[in-house]
Structures are given as structure tokens and as C-alpha cells.
Amino acid sequence: VITVDASNVVAALIDSGYYTAEDFENLPETSAPSQDITGRVGIVLPTRDEPRWVQDETRFQEALAAAGYEVSILFSQGDSARERANVEDLITRGIEVLIITPHDGDAAAAAAAAAKAAGVTVISYDRLITNTDAVDYYVTFDSVAVGEAQAQYLVDKAEGTGNPLYLYAGAASDNNAFLFFEGAWNVLQPKIADGTFYIVNSSEAVALQDQAELSREQLAQIIGQITTNWDFNTAKNLAEANLTVATVEDKGDVFILAPNDGTARAIADAFGVDSDVTSYVVTGQDAEQASVQYIIDGKQSMTVFKDVRTLVNDAIKVAVAVLEGQTPETTGAYNNGAIDVPALQSEVITVDASNVVAALIDSGYYAAEDFTGLE
């Protein structure tokens, strides 16, 4: 718990992103000090409600403290208007570099443009801000490779032909959801074409199953039908609805493309209690602590480990290079609909029960005491 009074109300409740300054009148004059940021880096993350972003906050704080910088980290709580207000707040503090994970890639374009107009270098972090030339750099995991790793896991576990395949995706407002699904489709489509899998829960995907490459519009058609909106309850409700209309023949031993760990757990909970489901293989992403426990317990099959420490360090590397007047290292580029954004990409690792200790415990990412049932 934190004691809050007039002396720290701004730091505790506004700077943390819990509220915005616009929610109140007569805030103390300390609400936007332009000198408070050493290194002049501001960070805007999308929500505190997903463990992944709380992890990122912690890693940023630790890494920047170790590097001798202070940082202001604000959360937008899934609200593009609050996101814009957060960016404007940081601009008034005199930041020179903005690291931002957009809630909605298109909607964040206005915030990026405002930062750019103020002379701020904009680094899109993990999710790409779309349809604007105001993005300078993109720091990300190889999102297509994430989807390919998820799909390859399903392929490797499948035997014979005629295996039921259930498809789920992230939020249609998130460019990464398109990249994840694109990567998965790269691997799954040939195995759908040869009969290894058949699609159960998406008529849009069935209509396009003979196409090896999908346009953005075609991806949008599929994602619009199978979106979880990155939300646990939405994912569980959708999975339950799919199972309600599925035949017994569409159950048995099933294969499930789930886009991330939160949705994977939700979908696993739904499939796990259906008496007609004999077994399921379900993918995930982010190596959230709860999903690691699910993997240990045999309730989630795998996760794609995206070491936040690496991504945070890459973002800081780009930010520091900018602050020191250097050109940051990049390894590729992503088209955001307006320009090709120079990108620094981090590697991903497939984790399941066979390597969970080596990948996540021995690496120091988690402690063995965080889990039960480890061998």
C-alpha cells in the first residue's frame, strides 16, 4: 500500500498513469516539471492489467537505473485518449526520446505526430504505430517468427491427417496481431492444404485456406472473426461458443493456435472441461508466470519466450544512441503503411515442459520458488 497526500498525489496517482491530470482541478504545480527527467526519456505502456507490461515497467526501471538514467513511465489503461494525454504530459516535461507501446496503432499516430512536432524522437516499442511518418525507430521481437514458432509447434505435435484446428488471434487494432497470424499462416497453410489440419471455427479462414499468402484485408477478415482482443474473458467466451457449436467429430484430439499466454489459459480452461475433448495442444506467448505454471501442470503446451530484458535493453540502446547524437543500430525495417520504419529485432525462444527450467529458471528470468511441481 502507498500513503498518498498533497505532497505526493501527482507522483503516486498521475505520473504512475493511474489517473490523468485532466481528471482533476488545482493539481500541485509539481505536476509537470521540465527538469525532472535525467536523460529525458519518457515511456508510455498500454495497460497495467496484463502481467507482461508490468514486467516491462520493472525491467525498464531496473535497466535505466543501472545505466544512470531516470525515466517516467505512464500507463494508458487501454485508452487512446489517455495515451495521447500521457504523451503530451511527457512532452511538457522536456523529454527528448519517447518510447511508446500503442494501445491502437492507428490511433497512436496523432500522439506520435505531436511528439515529433515537439522535436522528440519516437521509438515504437513492441507494437508498431501505423499510418504515420512520425515514427523514427521500432524495437520489437520478430513478430512473424513468433507466429511461425507457434504454428511449427502445432505441426510438430500433429500426427496423420484430419486433425481439428482452432484459430484465435489478438486485437484487430494491434498491428502485431496481424504479424503473428501472418507467421502462423505461413506454416499452417501448407499443412491445411495437405490435410494434416482442417479449420473448425473460422469460415473466413476456410474460404482462404488455399492461399499461401494473404493480403492485409484478407488477414483482417479472418482476425475479425477470431479476435480475442487480447482479453481473457473474451477469449474464454469465444472458445466456449466455438465448442458449443462444434460437433463431436470436431473435438477429440485438437490443436489450438492461441495468440498469447493470457488467451491461451482462457482457451485451455474452456477446452479442458469439455468432455468430448480428449486432448489439446495450445500455443502461447510471453512466458507469463501463470502460463509457465500451466505448462508445468500440463494445461498449456508451450509459450514463445520473448525475454523482456533483451527488448528493454534494445530500446534503451536505441534511446541512448539518439541522446548521444549517434545513429542507432538496426537489423531490418517494417512498413507501417506510410514509411519503412528502421527496426531492431530481438530473438524469440520456444519453451515447453522439456526446456522450461533451462530457458526460464537457469537463465534467471524466474526463480524456482515461483513455481510448484518443477522437476
Regions picked out by a protein language model, each given a short descriptive name:
Residues 1-375:
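A residue-level marker of the well-folded mature domains of exported/periplasmic proteins
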